[in-house]
A protein has these predicted regions:
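Short, flexible helix-adjacent loops and helix caps
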Residues: 5-9, 50, 54-57, 92, ...
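Amphipathic alpha-helical packing segments from all-alpha helical-bundle domains
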Residues: 67, 82-89, 97-131, 137-142
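Amphipathic alpha-helical linker/stalk segments
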Residues: 43-75, 81-82
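C-terminal peripheral helix-coil segments that are non-catalytic and often amphipathic
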Residues: 71, 78, 116-135, 141-177
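Hydrophobic/aromatic residues within well-ordered alpha-helical segments
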Residues: 34, 41, 45, 72, ...
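Helix-turn-helix
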Residues: 3-36, 40
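Short hydrophobic clusters on alpha-helical segments that form packing/core surfaces
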Residues: 1-4, 76
Length: 177
């Protein structure tokens, strides 16, 4: 997985096999092609149980809502960068295989992982502080996730990005003075 995160679509099956400590042919006994291998990696990376456990660990020691939100933003950013790298690799492979005429729909595991991660944010971060919110915990989770995605989207320049502290402040206190 780190190899794919580092190299994305340019990672070769030889590099992947070496990183896994197996012969390249072994990969193709398990996976029919590089696309299937990358999908398996993406599905592993997005494992909803692992995502929820990682989030729960990230916010476990946070005493207040702001600390939980900052920890969640930092954890979500790291996860999003990894996911975007792997999903970009998948998109390149689909395009190279002739599937580039229309945008592919997201794989079912991606939709499910996103839904469960939003539920985990709502449950672990916002539900314990529901009385401090003007919206439901689920709506707060969606807004947080949208801010993180927008701030660290590949099209956003590094100079324009705000820190987790800044995003948490905007999320919890708004934009107005």
């Amino acid at each position: 997985m780190p190899l794919l995160i580092e190299h994305g679509p340019t990672a070769t099956t030889r590099q992947i096999a070496e990183a896994a400590g197996v012969a390249e042919g072994t990969l193709f006994r398990v996976f029919p092609d590089k696309r299937a291998l990358l999908f398996a990696v993406a599905e592993h990376l997005l494992d909803p149980d692992r995502g929820e456990a990682t989030l729960a660990d990230a916010v476990a020691d946070a005493a207040d809502l702001e600390s939980k939100v900052i920890a969640t933003i930092e954890q979500s950013r790291t996860r999003m960068e990894q996911v975007l790298t792997v999903m970009t690799a998948l998109r390149h492979i689909a395009h190279d295989e002739g599937g580039g005429d229309r945008p592919p729909s997201p794989p079912a595991f991606l939709v499910e992982a996103n839904r469960r991660f939003l539920d985990a944010i709502a449950d672990h971060v916002f539900a314990p502080h529901a009385d401090e919110l003007r919206v439901t915990p689920q709506e707060a989770a969606l807004v947080l996730r949208s801010l993180v995605f927008g701030m660290w989207h590949p099209g956003t320049s590094a100079e324009s990005r705000m820190s987790a502290d800044q995003l948490a402040s905007i999320l919890l206190k708004g934009l107005a003075r």
